[in-house]
């Protein structure tokens, strides 16, 4: 999103007073704790996720976005969840399974990654619901 010509920050949604939509702190802490318990074989990282209107497959573009917006990852859906939750005063959390770094270093094919991500996500979601 680039509405800088209208006085908004780059990335800011016009007519929105917020530039980013922080996740609920309690949900964030719970997800980090639970993920380490039910999925000890994966790494858990916390930070801003940058959302945009394009699939990023170029390392230079990814690095520029992360540098400019202070993000940890780049994707296409999270901001819509954050915006809807923010506008409706609903606590939210976005959890992402990162398939690759947009630099050719992916260590498994997408079908294999997809199955692992589904398994990890189900374990995380079930345990989080149990603990809420």
What are the language-model segments listed below?
Residues 102-132:
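His/Asp/Glu-rich mid-to-C-terminal helical/loop segments that flank catalytic regions of hydrolases
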Residues 22, 26, 60, 76-80, ...:
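Conserved active-site and cofactor/substrate-binding residues in soluble primary-metabolism enzymes
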Residues 54-107:
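A C-terminal functional module that forms or caps the active site or interfaces directly
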């Amino acid at each position: 999103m680039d509405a800088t010509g209208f006085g908004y920050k780059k990335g800011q949604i016009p007519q929105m007073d917020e530039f980013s939509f922080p996740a609920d702190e309690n949900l964030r802490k719970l997800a980090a704790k639970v993920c380490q318990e039910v999925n000890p074989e994966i790494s858990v990282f916390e930070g801003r996720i940058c959302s945009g209107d394009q699939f990023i497959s170029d390392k230079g573009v990814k690095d520029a976005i992360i540098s400019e917006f202070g993000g940890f990852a780049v994707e296409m859906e999270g901001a819509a969840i954050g915006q809807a939750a923010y506008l409706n005063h609903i606590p939210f959390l976005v959890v992402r399974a990162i398939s690759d770094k947009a630099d050719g270093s992916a260590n498994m094919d997408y079908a294999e990654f997809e199955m692992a991500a589904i398994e990890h996500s189900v374990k995380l979601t079930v345990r989080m619901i149990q603990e809420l």
